[in-house]
UniProtKB/Swiss-Prot annotation:
Alphabetized UniProt keyword annotations: Acetylcholine receptor inhibiting toxin, Disulfide bond, Ion channel impairing toxin, Neurotoxin, Postsynaptic neurotoxin, Secreted, Toxin
Protein name: Toxin aagardi
Disulfide linkage: 3-22, 17-39, 41-52, 53-58
Localisation per UniProt entry: Secreted
CDD domains: TFP_snake_toxin
Organism: Hydrophis torquatus
PROSITE patterns in the record: SNAKE_TOXIN
Chief localization: secreted
Tissue specificity of this protein: Expressed by the venom gland.
C-alpha cells in the first residue's frame, strides 16, 4: 500500500507501507496548524485530530 508522508504543506511524497491503512494527524501549536502523514493508524493524544483511511494515497 502507498501512503503520503509529507509534513504540513510540503510537496507530496509517498512511501510504501506494509499494512493496509494510512493516517493524517492534525494539531495546532505556536507554529500554526501542523499536519503529519504516514503509515498505519496510531493512537493519538487528546487534542489531535486523526483520520485513518484504507486506499492508496488516501491521506493526502
Amino acid at each position: 500500500m502507498t501512503c503520503c508522508n509529507q509534513q504540513s504543506s510540503q510537496p507530496k511524497t509517498t512511501t510504501n507501507c506494509a499494512g493496509n491503512s494510512c493516517y493524517k494527524k492534525t494539531w495546532s501549536d505556536h507554529r500554526g496548524t501542523i499536519i503529519e502523514r504516514g503509515c498505519g493508524c496510531p493512537q493519538v493524544k487528546s487534542g489531535i485530530k486523526l483520520e485513518c483511511c484504507h486506499t492508496n494515497e488516501c491521506n493526502n
